[in-house]
Amino acid sequence: MRTMVLLFFMLLAVYESAQQQTLEDKVQNLVDLTSRQSIVKFNMDKWKTLVRMQPRNYSMIVMFTALSPGVQCPICKPAYDEFMIVANSHRYTSSEGDRRKVFFGIVDYEDAPQIFQQMNLNTAPILYHFGPKLGAKKRPEQMDFQRQGFDADAIGRFVADQTEVHVRVIRPPNYTAPVVIALFVALLLGMLYMKRNSLDFLFNRTVWGFVCLAITFIFMSGQMWNHIRGPPFMITNPNTKEPSFIHGSTQFQLIAETYIVGLLYALIAIGFICVNEAADQSNSKDRKNAGKKLNPLSLLNIPTNTLAIAGLVCICVFFSFLLSVFRSKYRGYPYSFLFA
């Protein structure tokens, strides 16, 4: 009897030793793979061994994507770029202990369609967190791109919430903006040099008014956010395949969305200009001097009442559209006017 008990404990010790050795081998394999590049590109064998098979004392952040041009996934490449920023930041800024707790990987549909079938996935991109104790049949935690966005900061917050490992996101320098600014300044200086004998346009109030309005609309629409984050022009709903020009999250936006918001602000401004011009025309008692006003609205010779009504319609309609855009991005937004 004692021999049987002793043999049982010996076998148990050998099993635990082999299991521990297997775990150490898996972690070391991942460390070796991520020492050459920040992410692990999974095939079926690596997927079964490193992600789905126990034992595992580390977390895997895996993006399922389709980067092949034939798949026609417009947001896969931007989402992959943001994912790589987080993975590279984790590789170069996290401590050695944190780098052994969290690993980043990618499954491309072209390279491993069997993994997509195993996970019952027919859309991309999708980001999953496979925790240390997640079983082979349990569903991993998924990041909600529609609500949270897929920029690097949002992915970093998802990683921190799931793993308690905080990744300091560091973006690579973007030299596009400085080059564009330098070219614009050079063009402006060249124009000033060519017109050095006639600089009257610098004192034209209409020109400066248009310049100020253009700058205001650009910044109010969120165009600078686009230059910093580089979002896609639009996205396609993976379920309905319908294009979406406004992202349904306050943490992300699309390029088309900034154009829409900027246009709405411009139309609202035109409405206020019409109302203001109508008030000036109605209050002006000197018709001779009023006829000398050199602005487009006075030159069109539009009746005062028509101008005022057109301005009010522009303000009411397009301001209502603007509020509806805000409500579509934030469901708890309390204000609306003509449209829900």
UniProtKB/Swiss-Prot annotation:
GO terms for cellular component: oligosaccharyltransferase complex. One of its GO terms (biological process) is protein N-linked glycosylation via asparagine. This is Probable dolichyl-diphosphooligosaccharide--protein glycosyltransferase subunit 3. Keywords: Disulfide bond, Endoplasmic reticulum, Membrane, Signal, Transmembrane, Transmembrane helix. It comes from Caenorhabditis elegans. Residues 1-20 form the signal peptide. The chain crosses the membrane at residues 174-194, 206-226, 255-275, 306-326. Component of the oligosaccharyltransferase (OST) complex. The keyword Disulfide bond applies. Pfam families: OST3_OST6 (PF04756). Disulfide bonds join C73-C76. Belongs to the OST3/OST6 family. It is a multi-pass membrane protein. Residues 33-164 form the Thioredoxin domain. Subunit of the oligosaccharyl transferase (OST) complex that catalyzes the initial transfer of a defined glycan (Glc(3)Man(9)GlcNAc(2) in eukaryotes) from the lipid carrier dolichol-pyrophosphate to an asparagine residue within an Asn-X-Ser/Thr consensus motif in nascent polypeptide chains, the first step in protein N-glycosylation. N-glycosylation occurs cotranslationally and the complex associates with the Sec61 complex at the channel-forming translocon complex that mediates protein translocation across the endoplasmic reticulum (ER). All subunits are required for a maximal enzyme activity. Its main location: endoplasmic reticulum. The lineage of its organism: Eukaryota, Metazoa, Ecdysozoa, Nematoda, Chromadorea. It comes from the Eukaryota.
